A protein has these predicted regions:
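Active-site segments of SGNH/GDSL-like serine hydrolases
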Residues: 221-247
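Secreted/periplasmic serine-hydrolase-like ester/acetyl group-modifying domain
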Residues: 115-227, 317-320
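Histidine-centered active-site loop/cap adjacent to the catalytic His
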Residues: 286-320
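Membrane/wall-proximal cationic-aromatic binding patches
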Residues: 12-88
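Membrane-embedded segments
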Residues: 56-137
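N-terminal Sec-pathway targeting helices
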Residues: 1-9
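Extracytoplasmic/secreted cell-surface and envelope-processing proteins
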Residues: 106-113, 242-244, 280-283
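Substrate-gating cap/lid alpha-helix
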Residues: 240-273
Length: 320
């Protein structure tokens, strides 16, 4: 009886901590950061645009007039871009603009595998669209997320308010700090993709990833053609400090060569804002200073994007 009582107590404490964790500021901010839908997505007949993408797109798109839906999740691979788009295809009318937003490392990555990175899809997608679906992972991800929280589980006990990154409006730091932030980002990419540098590194070991993602991109093109959607390839803005970390030769080999020919062959509009003058030296447009747009930055970017879509005949109706 004593053992049973202790076991019941442990279970009760676990359930309580899990409940508190799911309702903590940390967990709610995580949900918002991922852009995980907390309720059914509202698809109105006024929707003109749907965007895909990962973290950079998560902070680039905000539809101030409710004329679009963001399917960007943080983080997200091209595989799940397509899974989400196909999953919601019945809600997306013909002539909708579909923006495929390409972060720098997109084509060097096949997929994310850790539960921390894919848990969001267990809330949103049917199991046949989740790679290596597991009922156990579903139970952990949806019912008991405290089990993969690690040290962050402390927020189930100490529920301290944390500001959401989504609401950040500007970044006020020194030039030296901005360069350090850019370097830290690049160090992560070098480690993740096994690159010696970002100027002339050998990328032959990444060819299987490049080929895998090119096939997915062709699938995306075919899907948009079949549905009558207007596909657009977009490269997001980066601050000068970030752009200085790369050579153009490296980016052509590692990045642009994976989609430029597909765009040309299929007559897909390509809009590149990476070197846009507006974003080079106004770090208040990025909440992290270099590549994740702030609230102000989103307004500037969305205005530019919508006007460019209008000029190219993609945006129907009055000029934005």
């Amino acid at each position: 009886m004593i053992v049973l009582g202790i076991l019941c107590l442990i279970i009760m404490v676990f359930i309580l901590l899990n409940y508190r964790y799911k309702n903590s500021f940390y967990y709610q901010n995580l949900v918002e950061f991922e852009n995980r839908p907390v309720r059914k997505i509202y698809w109105s007949d006024k929707i003109k645009m749907v965007n895909l993408g990962s973290v950079h797109a998560r902070f680039a798109f905000q539809y101030f007039k409710n004329e679009g839906v963001s399917l960007a999740r943080a983080p997200q691979s091209l595989y799940y871009d397509i899974q989400l788009l196909e999953n919601y295809s019945k809600h997306i009318p013909r002539d909708t603009i579909v923006v495929a937003f390409f972060p720098i490392g997109l084509f060097a990555l096949k997929n994310y595998t850790s539960l921390n990175q894919i848990a969001k899809y267990y809330y949103e997608l049917p199991k046949d669209r989740i790679e290596k679906y597991s009922l156990l992972k579903y139970i952990i991800a949806v019912k008991y997320p405290i089990l993969y929280a690690g040290k962050k589980a402390i927020y189930s006990i100490v529920n301290r308010k944390i500001d959401s990154e989504w609401s950040y409006q500007k970044c006020v730091v020194s030039e030296e700090r901005l360069k350090k932030i850019a370097q830290e980002h690049c160090d992560v990419w070098k480690k993740q993709f096994q690159l010696e540098n970002l100027t002339d590194a050998d990328t032959t070991h990444l060819i299987p990833c490049f080929e895998y993602n090119r096939k997915l991109l062709e699938r995306l093109v075919d899907k948009c053609k079949a549905q009558g959607w207007k596909l657009v390839f977009v490269n997001g803005p980066m601050a000068r400090q970030m752009n200085e970390m790369f050579s153009e030769k490296f980016l052509q080999n590692f990045y642009y060569s994976n989609f430029q020919d597909i765009a040309e062959k299929n007559n897909v509009l390509h809009l590149d804002y990476r070197l846009d003058d507006t974003f080079q030296d106004d770090n208040n447009l990025f909440w992290n200073g270099v590549d994740w747009l702030s609230e102000t930055g989103r307004r500037v970017f969305m205005e530019k994007l919508e006007n460019d879509l209008y000029k190219n005949g993609y945006w129907e109706g009055d000029q934005p």
